[in-house]
């Protein structure tokens, strides 16, 4: 059995100033206090709901792999307000197992970061980016941990891929980022 639980990240992206920022990052604590740790789902839900009150959220993509029941509730509450949608039937769903789409979104983020077009804020989010390793596959490059049981988290970087993907879809849909501060979130 794996001894390290993945983190959960809720990452915002400002279309106005092109900045990625952590809204919430939940990681398994080290040592005995990390034994039996689980992501605090109620806390994550509260942060998502607070983000919709605080920001003008135009897109919110989340990998439903472990969150499908919660995402269905978020879709019922917020799906109609989103300008960009993961799919027609599930506006928040964005499966991370769709390799070719993940590769394209990863390349998009990598290009923007390497060209200085996106600012990454928060020490924990920066650490997640530094922990991410390039993994080449048949479809292209994705990110991964250094090894599967690595305690070094990359979930914030993975969440950032979806935040930027939602942002690029918003721009393509004509969301005007100059009038108001427009932010997107991903969990």
Where are these regions (language model features)?
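RNase H-like, metal-dependent nuclease domains and their acidic two-metal-ion catalytic environment used
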Residues: 1-99, 103, 107, 111, ...
